[in-house]
Regions:
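Transmembrane and membrane-interface helices of multi-pass
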Residues: 1-179
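Active-site rim elements
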Residues: 30-34, 284-286, 388-397, 405-408, ...
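Membrane-interface soluble catalytic domains
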Residues: 8-18, 54-56, 127, 131-134, ...
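Short beta-strand segments
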Residues: 309-311, 360-367, 394, 417-422, ...
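Active-site-proximal cap/lid insertion segments
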Residues: 315-319, 366-415, 432, 440-449
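Active-site-proximal alpha/beta segments of enzymes that process anionic O-linked groups
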Residues: 159-381, 449, 475, 479-508, ...
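Histidine-centered active-site microenvironments of extracellular/periplasmic hydrolases
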Residues: 242-246, 421-458
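Metal-dependent active-site segment of extracytoplasmic phospho-/sulfohydrolases and closely related
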Residues: 226, 399-437, 479-483
């Protein structure tokens, strides 16, 4: 019998097993990292062969279930990341997943339906292969020994890697060992969750660090500073910036009181990195979470301000996340469950507190976070139909604008100022099931271009700068901007708003979801353009 005939007979008898191997291999090569592909494929095949030779069906299913579910979940995550963002899954995405609260996950389930279906299909496919006891396959002894050799070799390589890392960093990390070992298994993406867990532990270790600053405190004539951080806001959908629908009438009515930034850009296309970049001394080029304690809250506290953090982004996992490591330093923190307007009573209470101290009040909004149709009460919808994604997104912008109008009303008779900016923008592709989505690898300018302005109460008169800024200004330098706005600076920093803007304007470096640094100016303007700025066939029409 020829080799071909033997293979043909084997394929006919075990075609489902061959199909599993092909699906696993192609999915991992296309949508995941190709690193250690041979070991991962051997691990996958040998595990299936070992399990198929377990004679007891209950025991076979008991052993198979965790392997099947983890492998299917890993592949589904890879497919989601690749199809949605055009990049492989990474530790940045893993951090975002771990920081998502249950309410947010439930709201976004509709966006994940195709990948939940993929998970179900892959799970059933792998179970269909494993469920049948097959004596024609190599014995458990042979496949078991081979599997142990693969596992032992992988563990040895992982230990070598962890040892070198410990030698360089003078400290051993079990997360590095677990992360490296995962890269040799079918559960490759566990590697990124291990790295995310390591980041979580590092954040816990530094969250209570309060540095001492040499500060220069200058009287700006302002007593109350309200900093509003929006979520997932696109400049292209704001009439303040020329959009055809009237989505920002309240802000536009205050145009004479506003210093507008026409070319503000976020340092990163996702919240877990963009907000710390904006509120701490961290930077695009030298990202290090040890910079996080050097933040606007700690500086305001040391300068004698009364500080508040009011958030409609869930308090789930309050400890050990990048944003909450900053928020927890505020003297008073409030988290609400529901729409952004629920923050207004807490803002009123903060304003009414009698004190001789200046106040810094941070409002962290849910804004236009996906799915936008759930970001506002249906009674607040002004654009129809309400199940249209563009109408939903525009309604979310209008809802935020209404909230801003109410904030202005609360502050108009006070010596107060409001700074508003969004953490990042969003991509838009009308051909996709989910039209609006976060930027991924080499994101377009739309994922970074954000609204930003400073509003000054009429009580402050004409002695403040309300001119429009047309140069690029990255929110990665907003910690310096906010410090100067409050009149609380370090000697080495620019001291005034004008000095900060003059010093940092034009720096257009951004980081994408793959942690690669790009020049914003060189990115394509829209997601539906190719890298040279030409409309793609999918984006035409």
């Amino acid at each position: 019998m020829t080799v071909f005939n033997k293979f043909a007979r084997s394929f006919k008898s075990h075609w489902l097993l061959y199909l599993c191997v092909i699906v696993f291999g192609i999915t991992n090569l296309v949508a995941s990292s190709g690193a250690h592909m041979v070991q991962r494929l051997l691990f996958f095949v040998l595990t299936i062969l070992v399990v198929k030779r377990i004679s007891s069906l209950p025991l076979r299913l008991l052993v198979a279930a965790p392997f099947v579910l983890l492998t299917a979940a890993d592949m589904s995550i890879s497919l989601y990341s690749w199809c949605t963002f055009g990049t492989t899954f990474n530790d940045g995405f893993a951090i975002s997943v771990l920081q998502s609260d249950p309410d947010e996950v439930v709201k976004m389930l509709g966006m994940y339906i195709p990948y939940l279906c993929a998970f179900a299909f892959l799970s059933l496919l792998f179970l269909a292969v494993i469920i049948k006891y097959d004596v024609s396959l190599p014995t458990k002894k042979v496949t078991g020994i081979l599997l142990l050799i693969v596992i032992s070799g992988s563990l040895f390589s992982a230990c070598q890697f962890a040892y070198k890392d410990a030698k360089n960093k003078k400290a051993f990390s079990p997360y590095i060992l677990a992360s490296r070992f995962a890269t040799y298994t079918p559960f490759f993406n566990l590697n990124y969750f291990a790295l995310a867990a390591k980041e979580h532990q590092r954040l816990l270790s530094i969250a209570n660090t309060v540095p001492y600053f040499q500060l220069s405190v200058r009287d700006t004539g302002i007593d109350t500073y309200v900093l509003i951080v929006g979520e997932s806001v696109r400049v292209d959908n704001m009439s303040l910036y020329g959009y055809t629908r009237s989505t920002t009438p309240q802000v536009e009515a205050q145009r004479k009181q506003i210093k507008l930034f026409n070319q503000a850009i976020s340092g990163a296309p996702y919240t877990a990195l963009s907000v710390p970049l904006s509120l701490t001394a961290d930077s695009v080029l030298s990202h290090d979470i040890h910079n996080y304690p050097d933040n606007i809250i700690n500086m305001a506290n040391q300068a004698g301000f009364q500080t508040f953090w009011l958030s409609s982004q869930s308090a789930f996992r309050q400890n050990g996340t990048a944003v909450t490591s900053i928020a927890m330093r505020a003297m008073e923190t409030v988290y609400v469950r529901g729409f952004d307007e629920l923050l207004l009573p807490h803002l009123s209470q903060a304003l009414q507190q009698k004190t001789q101290q200046k106040k810094l009040i941070v409002l962290h909004l849910n804004g236009s976070h996906e799915p936008a149709c759930s970001a506002y009460p249906q009674s607040s919808a002004v654009f129809q139909p309400q199940d249209d994604q563009d109408a939903c997104y525009d309604n979310s912008i209008h809802y935020t604008d209404s909230l801003l109008g109410q904030v202005f009303e609360l502050l108009k008779d006070r010596r107060a100022s409001v700074m508003y900016f969004a953490d990042h923008g969003l991509e838009r592709d009308p051909k996709k099931k989910n039209v609006y989505f976060h930027g991924g690898r080499e994101a377009s300018q739309q994922a970074y271009h954000v609204p930003m302005f400073i509003w000054y109460s009429p009580v402050l008169g004409d002695g403040v700068d309300r001119t429009t800024e047309n140069d690029i200004f990255s929110t990665a330098y907003n910690n310096y901007l906010i410090n100067a706005w409050m009149g609380v600076t370090k000697p080495e920093q620019p001291q005034t708003l004008e000095e900060v803007i003059a010093h940092y304007k034009g720096d257009s470096r951004v980081v994408d979801a793959n942690h690669d640094v790009f020049d914003y100016v060189m990115l394509r303007k829209e997601f539906t353009e190719d890298k040279q700025g030409n409309p793609t066939p999918e984006g035409q029409g």
